[in-house]
UniProtKB/Swiss-Prot annotation:
GO terms of biological process kind: fatty acid biosynthetic process; secondary metabolite biosynthetic process
Pathway involvement of the protein, from the record: Lipid metabolism; fatty acid biosynthesis
Subunit structure comment from the entry: Homodimer.
Known function: Catalyzes the condensation reaction of fatty acid synthesis by the addition to an acyl acceptor of two carbons from malonyl-ACP. Catalyzes the first condensation reaction which initiates fatty acid synthesis and may therefore play a role in governing the total rate of fatty acid production. Possesses both acetoacetyl-ACP synthase and acetyl transacylase activities. Its substrate specificity determines the biosynthesis of branched-chain and/or straight-chain of fatty acids.
High-level lineage: Bacteria, Pseudomonadati, Pseudomonadota, Alphaproteobacteria, Rickettsiales
Stated name of the protein: Beta-ketoacyl-[acyl-carrier-protein] synthase III
A UniProt-annotated Pfam family: ACP_syn_III_C
One GO MF term: 3-oxoacyl-[acyl-carrier-protein] synthase activity
Gene transcribed to yield this protein: fabH
Length: 317
């Protein structure tokens, strides 16, 4: 028994900042950004547009795509690093926006690996029989954590949200397997300079880029190889590889090491930048909207985030 995605939806704020526009207030240039990251632009939420608003708009699309009633949802999980408030959770605010009553809702924080963590948790809860229809969302306003004077980080991130509706599968489609990991000894590679119990502020993103690149390749590769081996899959069985959209160099290097054909690799980092927990569901939504994906296709997800946290998932569409 497993669970499957019956609907998906993505939302990106309408405001776009190109690399050229960044050069007006950051010491950088388009070539430098493109060469190192593959990013051409990023979507930026407005001052009065919060993570809960992004989540709501993507949730509406996923509910419509799944062709269900909002009242069919019996659990909400939002994966986010950028909540509107320290409390209550973004999920409970969304609960109110959707007009729901009494069903549980909570946030999950595993940074860029959040969607993989959330997917494994949602799967377990559905398979247990406790819940039938789960709304799982990755939603981030990453620009709220940026130091716009730090060109090594401010060029990398964008805002957005991606949602999926999960239900029990009655056939061979759905989540085949997933794995998640963490390594707390590596937290100083990527973190924020603040927190509510530390100094009462959210802080700004601090990153050791070269170390993170090495860890990303090593850990994502091992996670993927473990998944394939455990489920007797080969790389040639994969129809679409949807990695976390952090950096084009990481994506390309993984594809090279795994020997995955170029047309199978889903890349949205060019236009979305790094949307943290939202990046995989946003990329999935874009792939689905393209009309390329078909029933029976095998999808491979892979992500790594601060913590460090990482993991992967195999899905039969």
């Amino acid at each position: 028994m497993t669970c499957k995605i019956i609907g998906s939806g993505g939302y990106l704020p309408p405001k776009i900042i190109s690399n050229d526009e960044l050069t007006k207030f950051v010491d950088t240039n388009d070539k430098w950004i493109r060469t190192r990251t593959g990013i051409l632009q990023r979507h930026i939420a407005g001052d009065a547009e919060y993570t809960s608003h992004l989540a709501f708009k993507s949730a509406q699309k996923a509910i419509e795509d799944a062709m269900i009633s909002v009242d069919d949802i019996d659990l909400i999980i939002i994966c986010t690093t950028t909540p509107d408030n320290s409390f209550p959770s973004v999920a409970t605010k969304l609960h109110g926006y959707l007009g729901l009553t009494n069903i549980p809702s909570f946030d999950l924080q595993a940074v860029c690996a959040g969607f993989i963590y959330g997917l494994q948790l949602a799967h377990s809860l559905i398979v247990s029989g406790k819940y039938k229809t789960i709304l799982l969302i990755g939603a981030e306003k990453m620009t709220s954590l940026l130091d716009w004077n730090d060109r090594s980080t401010c060029v990398l991130f964008g805002d957005g949200a991606g949602s999926v509706i999960l239900q029990r599968s009655n056939d061979d489609s759905g989540l085949i397997d997933s794995n998640i990991f963490s390594s707390g000894t590596d937290y100083e590679i990527l973190y924020t300079s603040g927190g509510t119990s530390m100094n009462g502020t959210s802080g700004k993103i601090v990153m050791q880029g070269q170390k993170l690149f090495r860890h990303a390749i090593e850990k994502m590769l091992q996670s993927i190889e473990d998944l394939l081996y455990a489920n007797q899959f080969s790389v040639s069985d994969i129809d679409y590889f949807i990695p976390h959209q952090a950096n084009i160099r990481i994506i390309n290097k993984l594809a090279e090491l795994l020997n995955i054909e170029e047309h199978k690799v889903v890349k949205t980092v060019e236009k979305h930048a790094n949307c943290s927990a939202a990046s995989i569901p946003l990329a999935l939504s874009a792939l689905k909207e393209s009309g390329k994906i078909k029933k029976g296709d095998i999808l491979l997800f892979s992500a790594i985030g601060a913590g460090l946290t990482w993991g992967g998932a195999l899905i039969r569409w």
